[in-house]
Amino acid sequence: MDFIKRKRVIFMESEIKTNKIKIEKINENDYNRIFVMSDIHGQYDLFLKMLDRIDLKREDLLVIIGDICDRGKKSYEIYMKCMKMIKLGYNLKFILGNHEDMLLEDLENDYPIRYETEYSVFRNSKYFENKDMKDWHEENFLEEIEWLVKWLKNCPLIISGNENIFVHAGLDLKKVLEKQEKETVLWTREEFWLMENVELEEYKGKNIYFGHTPNINGRISKKTDRIKGIDCGAFFTHFLGCIEIKSQEEIYVYENEHIQFPEVLDKVFREIWNEEVAEFIDSEKYKIKSRKSGIEKIRILKKLDREEKKVLKKFFEKYKKMFSKNI
């Protein structure tokens, strides 16, 4: 079977299409402890350090709410570690992030290893050792990624329990879970927690945990009593946060144990953000609202994501001396 046909078979065999909202139900009482983390972005060493810190048992549950891949150097290793843990009997659930969705879209509709997301995932994989992207074996590559494609295609976009909801980017609290739009749960930057006063009965009394939007001070952000943002910006802060939801204990690991993040950085970042991309983002959001095509919306959202990454990199470079201040 030639490369193109084989690739189509791999994607057709997956049960879940990525343009549908899949919701997985859980019962929190089935687990002793429930840990939640997000947006690891290829920071494999931080992930291992966090696993060591939380000392995950088979009676526990680990929920990763999206964006293992891209930006960092060891995305593939994290996926492999997760799969190994599952095979060893650990309870690990993964929610698709926008970067996984981009990865699947590009792998399905184009040749692999063409864009940054694919490269970031597979650059350290067995069949892709040549960094210039010129020499890789298509058939061997497909054999290697088949398990990952099937796993990701069957991951949910939302996990809902009796007391908690987990989602990558956010929710529209005016819509029930089954009516959420893929664009919202994967990409939104809206401050949806401000909509609590109009939320539906489905959300009352439930905690919501989300990632996607990094907290620049490297800490889990309590938006309301029930809504928490847990993306600590690991790909550029080198801080990874995790919360055990039953005890509400927050756990943090750092690449450098002597790094601290002054609270002023959050304010500084917002000033740079407004200066660099506010006008651009506003214009692009207008385009999104004026487009009926879902494909065109995703293209614009990808463009926004690339622009955000540029700003974050510029921010880190400009203020790196503040990041390395000794405690």
Name each region found by the language model.
Residues F3-K81:
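N-terminal active-site segment of His-dependent metallophosphoesterases
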Residues M37-S38, V63-G66, K93-N98, V167, ...:
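Active-site neighborhood of phospho(di)ester-bond hydrolases with catalytic His/Asp-centered motifs
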